[in-house]
């Protein structure tokens, strides 16, 4: 399999390490707050409104100061760039150790958000260019990844005359330059600026942002008639929109962002106009009528899942060998090469490459149990195809990922796809009409679009209209839509989907078998290649973890989590990971907080969850109606073998309204999703894996005969 050329930033810290929180409150002292949030290097210089402000923070032996340029993990396998403007802690969080950072964001010239509409792009943008923006917000210091270097244009090219090629993993993701500012809400840029004047000087950066807000913000029309006095003068902002800048020839060295229509004068005079004749007023007094309230038309953008980013080298990582190992073993980190999936990679790559080259639509169905590398393999294929597209060996294409576990309803998939294609946020019904019109009509400028529909099981509805549309659009002659469906069930099309949908999937199917213990050993050893000389893991420990996981599920993610937890245990004992520590980590993971919550549920809550699982397996749908689950619960209680089953069943019949409280409590605890709490026809589905419920209720004496 070819090695990916694209580089992605290293995610050393993914928020709070979840394995640190896997035990109960008695073990809370094991949480290393210094590792997660860092420590202050000095006393606060200011206290105001319940906050204490500091000038520097030490985290993982690295000092971060106000004015430093950093990369920040965004919580979804990607990263942002910004400059630190504030470091502080809140009085209410002082005992928890939480510390906060406020950053002014930089927007990358080749980021996804900058490639929404081609007419908004600058013709001379560079792969290492970032723009200073007006956006800023608050984040936990646990999200800080590392320092980065942001130069002016002259400094950058004096240091790197030929630029930084993407193959330089040690330089490419952490060196950038700034020559313009951007206001993303109005799609306007500033004139070229010398960033060396602003670098590491927050006062000058703040003045620049104020000037950008004044000059780049959208103009608002003023109501009322204009007087006959002196003509008003409106100063022209010294900026230009993206639309006008895209019309300038990129080969011109004297590239100017000002519009050609601007003259040398600073002000533009607008002559007064004759006011229109006033219409005859109504008899009703307008002061007695209630005015219609104005509605804010802004819509929060949908959460579109980005591709995971490639890790950097750990040569300069400040930390112990065990910390390096845990960073490499994290499920969010992406290795340099994908192990043990060469055949599946080649099949998926050839299918997508041929569809993009021929500019045709296609459907591909990928199935396999959780943790077998389905999504990771598709991401690997997409990154290689994008690299070929950037090199000009493949036509341009767009990529959109829709995760069934991250949408509240299946119809939201329409809005996500439309927003990914156009950048416009519309309702699901409107988006469906727009997409149908787009894919049924030809367009000479349309490029191919690859849609990854992950967790397809969660997008199955009773009428199956969403899946039918997504699998039918690729068959249209002008759609150029390529749908890659990923599900955990191999026979999902035959068992659940109707014949009209199954026929559109065709014979393009790629099954993923569970990993064997040999493959799991290879995967773990490849992750630990960077710390092999430190002798952190023994070969017997890796072999023991691989065999334990392969005997149960073959889930690579579970194997990596077990090894990470064993590394923490070994670091506390100043030793290396042994089979005994692997066994201890496995025992702790089976006693996770989720398992404890499920085991401590009431009898009625347990019966309801068992009924949902049975209903899912019987119907094949992730969603069920409340009345269907109630009927399933009654059926389960009839077959119970416990001595007091009849008494409990009678209580259920007499006090059936209690299920309303059961539903509310399970929904509030995040165990299930509930559409409408007050209706028996409401739809309900699990918010956790059904395997967690089976593991928690196995051996429960109250549920004998049904669980």
From Swiss-Prot:
Organism: Schizosaccharomyces pombe (strain 972 / ATCC 24843) (Fission yeast)
Residue list for modification Phosphothreonine: 292
Record lineage: Eukaryota, Fungi, Dikarya, Ascomycota, Taphrinomycotina
General function of this protein: Component of the origin recognition complex (ORC) that binds origins of replication. It has a role in both chromosomal replication and mating type transcriptional silencing. ORC binds to multiple sites within the ars1 origin of DNA replication in an ATP-independent manner.
Cellular component aspect of the GO annotation: chromatin; DNA replication preinitiation complex; nuclear origin of replication recognition complex; nuclear pre-replicative complex; nuclear replication fork; nucleus
Superkingdom assignment: Eukaryota
Listed InterPro entries: AAA+_ATPase, ATPase_AAA_core, BAH_dom, BAH_sf, Cdc6_ORC1-like_ATPase_lid, ORC1/CDC6, P-loop_NTPase
Gene responsible for this protein: orc1
Record's subcellular location: Nucleus; Chromosome
Record-listed Phosphoserine modification sites: 291, 320
Identification of the protein by name: Origin recognition complex subunit 1
BAH domain: residues covered: 62-193
List of residues binding Mg(2+): 454-455
Keyword Nucleotide-binding appears in the UniProt entry: yes
Binding site for ATP: 334, 368-376, 455, 488, 557
Keywords of the record: ATP-binding, Chromosome, DNA replication, DNA-binding, Magnesium, Metal-binding, Nucleotide-binding, Nucleus, Phosphoprotein
GO molecular function: ATP binding; ATP hydrolysis activity; chromatin binding; DNA replication origin binding; metal ion binding
Annotated stretches, region: Disordered: 216-302
The keyword Nucleus is annotated on this UniProt entry: yes
């Amino acid at each position: 399999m070819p090695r990916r050329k694209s580089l992605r930033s290293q995610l050393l810290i993914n928020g709070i390490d979840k394995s640190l929180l896997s035990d109960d409150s008695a073990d809370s002292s094991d949480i290393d707050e210094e590792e997660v949030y860092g420590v202050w290097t000095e006393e606060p210089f200011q206290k105001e409104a319940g906050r204490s402000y500091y000038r520097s923070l030490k985290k993982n032996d690295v000092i971060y100061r106000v004015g430093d340029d950093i990369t920040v993990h965004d919580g979804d396998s990607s990263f942002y760039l910004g400059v630190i403007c504030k470091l502080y802690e809140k009085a209410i969080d002082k005992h928890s150790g939480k510390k906060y950072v406020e950053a002014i964001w930089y927007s990358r010239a080749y980021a996804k958000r900058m490639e929404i509409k081609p007419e908004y792009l600058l013709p001379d943008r560079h792969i290492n260019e970032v723009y200073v923006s007006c956006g800023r917000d608050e984040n936990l210091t646990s999200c800080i990844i590392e320092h980065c270097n942001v130069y002016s244009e002259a400094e950058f090219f004096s240091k790197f005359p030929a630029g930084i090629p993407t193959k330089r993993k040690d330089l490419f993701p952490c060196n950038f330059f700034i020559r313009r500012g951007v206001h993303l809400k109005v799609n306007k840029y500033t004139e070229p600026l010398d960033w060396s004047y602003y670098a590491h000087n927050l006062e000058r950066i703040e003045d620049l942002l104020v000037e950008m807000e004044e000059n780049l913000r959208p103009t608002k029309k003023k109501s009322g008639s204009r007087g006959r006095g002196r003509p008003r003068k409106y100063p022209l902002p010294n900026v230009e929109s993206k639309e006008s800048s895209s019309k300038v020839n990129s080969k011109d060295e004297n590239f100017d962002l000002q519009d050609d229509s601007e003259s040398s004068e600073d002000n533009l005079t607008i002559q007064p106009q004759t006011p229109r004749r006033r219409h005859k007023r109504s008899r009703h007094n307008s002061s007695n009528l209630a005015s219609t309230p104005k509605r804010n038309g802004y819509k929060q953008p949908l959460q579109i899942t980005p591709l995971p980013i490639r890790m950097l080298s750990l040569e300069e990582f400040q930390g112990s060998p065990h910390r390096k190992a845990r960073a490499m073993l994290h499920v969010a980190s992406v290795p340099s090469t994908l192990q043990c999936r060469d055949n599946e990679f080649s099949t998926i790559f050839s299918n997508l490459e041929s569809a993009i080259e021929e500019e045709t639509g296609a459907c591909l169905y990928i199935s396999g149990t959780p943790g077998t590398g389905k999504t990771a393999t598709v991401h690997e294929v997409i990154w290689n195809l994008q690299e070929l597209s950037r090199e000009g060996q493949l036509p341009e294409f767009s990529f959109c990922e829709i995760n069934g576990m991250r949408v509240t309803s299946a119809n939201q998939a329409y809005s996500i796809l439309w927003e990914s294609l156009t950048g416009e946020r519309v309702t699901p019904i409107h988006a469906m009409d727009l997409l149908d019109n787009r894919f049924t009509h030809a367009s000479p400028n349309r490029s191919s679009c690859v849609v990854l529909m992950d967790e397809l099981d969660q997008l199955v509805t009773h009428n199956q209209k969403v899946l039918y549309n997504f699998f039918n659009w690729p068959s249209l002659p002008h759609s150029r839509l390529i749908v890659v469906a990923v599900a955990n069930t191999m026979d999902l099309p035959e068992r659940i989907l109707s014949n009209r949908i199954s026929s559109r999937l065709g014979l393009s199917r790629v099954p993923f078998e569970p990993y064997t213990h040999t493959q799991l050993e290879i995967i773990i050893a490849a992750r630990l290649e960077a710390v092999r000389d430190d002798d952190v893991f023994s070969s017997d420990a890796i072999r023991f973890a691989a065999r334990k996981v392969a005997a149960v599920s073959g889930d690579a993610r579970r194997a990596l989590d077990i090894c990470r937890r064993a590394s923490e245990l070994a670091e506390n004992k100043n030793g290396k990971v042994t089979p005994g520590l692997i066994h201890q980590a496995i025992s702790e993971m089976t006693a996770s907080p989720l398992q404890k919550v499920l085991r401590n549920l009431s009898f009625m809550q347990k019966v309801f969850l068992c009924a949902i699982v049975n209903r899912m397996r019987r119907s094949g749908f992730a969603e069920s109606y409340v009345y269907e689950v109630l009927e399933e619960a009654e059926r389960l209680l009839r077959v119970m073998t416990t001595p007091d089953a009849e008494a409990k069943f009678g209580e259920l019949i007499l006090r059936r309204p209690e299920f309303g409280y059961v539903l509310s409590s399970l929904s509030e605890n995040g165990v299930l999703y509930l559409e409408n709490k007050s209706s028996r026809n409401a739809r309900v589905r699990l918010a956790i894996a059904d395997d967690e419920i089976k593991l928690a209720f196995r051996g429960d004496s109250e549920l004998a005969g049904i669980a």
